[in-house]
Amino acid sequence: MIVYWQSTRKGQRLILSDDDNEINEEVGGVRETKRGFDAFAKTFGYEPGRAQKGIPTMEEAKEFVELLKPWELFSGGDGLAVDPLVRSAPE
């Protein structure tokens, strides 16, 4: 399993992928808005603390998501670290 950031048109998505790259699950994301960056970490319930708006920089928004470790909610996600390389979106 691997966790990595993937570029999108208005931000980045945090992806949990299996080793064969057959299963790709979005576990978080950051998008640019007029007021800064909005960030969220996926959850299986209602947890408003897993989303934040108006973060000043992309790096701070990504750090917010990574600190919540949303990939650990999924089987096989324990103990993983985020790959520092941002990947482009598949075409």
Language-model features and meaning:
Residues 1-40, 82, 86-90:
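Short N-terminal "domain-start" leader segments
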Residues 36-91:
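Mixed-charge, Lys/Arg-enriched low-complexity segments
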